[in-house]
């Protein structure tokens, strides 16, 4: 990525208390959207019925404009655009495996994930999209206003321009409230990044049939349901500042104590000294680990094999690379084929939380993944595929996995099955949970772990390459717990 894009993505003007208050007020408003929350599912079903969608797995030789390169066996597009599936050789001193090979998606382009907001009847509303993606288990999910790679919005596919993208290109169509580069899955993407943006407009915006205005409270309420709010919406939500030094959610004293603890967490520990300590912990954790990730031809990837229909690991674990054909009546291109990554099983992603002095803290983890640009990012307490450890003694499991798997259901404060990026991953789902533990749990956690407040995580999200995509999804989920709506 060019330095000019990096600079532009960090150029959004600092938000004052008034803007923070407007974000908070919208998050606390779940009952006065342009579409009532009770009618949202009818609207989504209507959009599904008004369009035609189909995704089918196909053999590799039925891919159109994709081929295995003769010299490298990398899976590439004929135009040299979009992305490639290539090999990665990994060496690290993190975790149980010192080295391995794997396929990985290399998509060098920086995409745009943007939500357009407008004040309607005094409350900020978000223009959201019912977007079909080939990997979605339920076809349509709630997407940002714009969710597009550079190849998409420069029309490399020779299709139409994504609606509303002009609001997010250049400066002048609206006021930029959020603009920060964030990563995607480091296990499946090689150094993939997107601009997470929120742009406010004053003008009237024509609402196309697959779009609707919702308050932040409505979107956060929908996040408590399975497979409704897509990954790209979740990451943008996580980057919205719901606090500053003077402003945050103000809840009545009669509110449920856990909700109060979450709200307090937004404004606790965000002074410069506390943030410096958190950054110092993370930098020290990164310095402990070495990561050497070398791009190699797919033909040199050890322990993986290719059939007519997939590229898979010899042990049947991890994931496979497959091919699909897609048709959709409401996308920029009516039909296409593409490779996708298909995980072998549903993942388990959990954040352990506890109240310290009435303030909620989450146990986060400095985690190394092969595709990260800067070695490690801050992850949830647990992030894994449990099936990969079924034959492993429990004392060799990832830290705190047993606590997550044996948690009392009454301590689970949030639980949803959420989908990962449906444009590249085929039916990739994870169970996301927020689990409360007692106050003396892990008082001195392992050095790669740290208790942090929601406010501290929010401060780090003002910059790039701190929180990974899974942690950002859980930050958005935490916001849904204080923003119960009114």
From Swiss-Prot:
It is an enzyme of class 4 (lyase). Keywords: Lyase. It catalyses: dTDP-4-dehydro-6-deoxy-alpha-D-glucose = dTDP-3,4-didehydro-2,6-dideoxy-alpha-D-glucose + H2O. GO terms for molecular function: lyase activity. Its EC number is 4.2.1.159. DTDP-4-dehydro-6-deoxy-alpha-D-glucose 2 binds at residues 187, 304, 367, 383-385, 388-389. The keyword Glycosyltransferase does not apply. Disulfide bonds: none annotated. It holds the Pfam family Hexose_dehydrat. DTDP-4-dehydro-6-deoxy-alpha-D-glucose 1 binds at residues 66, 149-153, 421-424. Disruption phenotype: Cells lacking this gene accumulate the pseudoaglycone (PSA) containing tri-O-methyl rhamnose, but lacking the dimethylamino sugar forosamine. Belongs to the hexose 2,3-dehydratase family. Two binding sites (pockets A and B) for the dTDP-sugar ligands have been identified in each subunit. It seems that pocket A represents the active site and pocket B is a vestige of the gene duplication event. Involved in the biosynthesis of forosamine ((4-dimethylamino)-2,3,4,6-tetradeoxy-alpha-D-threo-hexopyranose), a highly deoxygenated sugar component of several bioactive natural products such as the insecticidal spinosyns A and D. Homodimer. This is dTDP-4-dehydro-6-deoxy-alpha-D-glucopyranose 2,3-dehydratase.
């Amino acid at each position: 990525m060019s330095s000019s894009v990096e600079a532009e993505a960090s150029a959004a003007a600092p938000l004052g208390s008034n803007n923070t208050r407007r974000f908070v007020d919208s998050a606390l408003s779940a009952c006065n959207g342009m579409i009532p929350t009770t009618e949202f599912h009818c609207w989504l079903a209507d959009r599904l019925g008004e369009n035609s969608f189909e995704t089918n797995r196909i053999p590799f030789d039925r891919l159109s404009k994709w081929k295995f390169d003769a010299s490298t066996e990398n899976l590439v597009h004929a135009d040299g655009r979009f992305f490639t599936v290539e090999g990665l050789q990994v060496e690290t001193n993190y975790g149980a495996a010192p080295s391995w090979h794997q396929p990985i998606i290399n998509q060098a382009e920086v995409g745009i994930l943007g939500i357009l907001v407008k004040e309607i009847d005094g409350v900020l509303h978000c223009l959201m999209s019912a977007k079909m993606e080939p990997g979605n288990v339920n076809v349509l999910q709630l997407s940002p206003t714009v969710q597009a790679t550079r190849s998409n919005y420069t029309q490399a596919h020779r299709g139409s321009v994504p609606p509303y993208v002009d609001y997010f290109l250049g400066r002048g169509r609206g006021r930029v409230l959020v603009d920060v580069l964030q990563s995607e899955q480091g296990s499946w993407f090689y150094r993939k990044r997107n601009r997470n943006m929120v742009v406010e407009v004053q003008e009237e915006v024509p609402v196309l049939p697959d779009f609707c205005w919702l308050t932040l409270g409505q979107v956060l309420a929908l996040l408590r349901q399975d497979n409704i709010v897509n990954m790209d919406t979740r990451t943008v939500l996580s980057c919205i500042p719901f606090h500053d030094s003077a402003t945050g959610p103000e809840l009545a004293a009669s509110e449920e104590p856990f909700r109060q603890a979450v709200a307090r967490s937004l404004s606790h520990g965000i002074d410069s000294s506390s943030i410096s300590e958190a950054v110092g912990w993370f930098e020290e954790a990164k310095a402990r680990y070495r990561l050497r990730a070398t791009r190699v031809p797919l033909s040199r990837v050890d322990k993986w094999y290719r059939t007519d229909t997939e590229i898979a690991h010899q042990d049947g674990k991890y994931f496979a690379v497959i091919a699909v054909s897609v048709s959709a009546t409401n996308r920029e291109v009516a039909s296409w084929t593409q490779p996708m990554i298909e995980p072998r099983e549903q993942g388990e992603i959990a954040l352990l939380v506890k109240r310290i002095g009435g303030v909620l803290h989450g146990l986060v983890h400095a985690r190394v993944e092969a595709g990260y640009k800067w070695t490690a990012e801050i992850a949830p307490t647990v992030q894994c595929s449990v099936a990969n450890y079924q034959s492993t003694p429990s004392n060799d499991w990832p830290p705190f996995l047993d606590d997550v798997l044996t948690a009392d259901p009454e301590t689970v404060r949030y639980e949803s099955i959420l989908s990962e990026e449906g444009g590249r991953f085929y039916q990739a789902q994870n169970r996301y949970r927020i689990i409360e533990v007692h106050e003396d749990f892990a008082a001195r956690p392992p050095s790669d772990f740290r208790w942090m407040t929601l406010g501290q995580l929010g401060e780090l999200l003002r910059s790039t390459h701190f929180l990974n995509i899974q942690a950002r999804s859980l930050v958005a989920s935490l916001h849904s717990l204080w923003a119960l709506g009114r």
